[in-house]
Amino acid sequence: MVRVALVGARLNRMSATPISAAAEASDLELFEGEARLWTRAFEPTEATQLFDELRRDVKWQQEEVLIFGQRRRVPRLVAWHGDPGASYVYSGTDHLPEAWTPALARIRDRVQVLSGARFNAVLLNLYRDGRDGMGWHADDEPELGPNPVIASVSLGATRRFCLRHRRRKDLKLDLPLPHGSLLCMSGETQHHWLHAVPKTRLPVGERVNLTFRLVTLR
């Protein structure tokens, strides 16, 4: 059972596509948003195998961003994969997609079945320990369209995933995303909510996060 700290949201449980008997979905009824959580979209053994393959086969890179005229390293390793032409601009950098690996294609296909959405690209983030994190942001780039579906798979160590409403400071969520989980955000969520993976001083292992999306092909 996942402990969910909710403010301004309600959690409903419903059956998911019968890929696994344990693949139960929880609807997060967000104010001005939609989200659904599968805490066990992938069985532990399968999730560990996928984690190992991605850790080994993906060409991880540590990127730099320009902040107030200074170049600083992003506190995580990243990679971008997808269909030909699925390039994507984020953090001021234009990313050209690497081809789908067998593990990525396998995860993508499972996510598409569970979510009912189609995806042509994925952003991967490798959080090496608690010193790696992701600041507050929304996935609202023009390439994603007006109301994008963002499907986030977590493999490895459990990390906190935080959301807060852009205007209503009293509306917040704090979700621990476990190994093999899937969180799908849709509707107007990216217009009204920001999300982050905060750093932590607690000892924590490596985590691979994959955010699948449908981008406009160039």
Each predicted region: which residue ranges?
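Non-heme Fe(II) oxygenase metal-center motifs and adjacent flexible, charged/small-residue loops
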Residues: 2-218
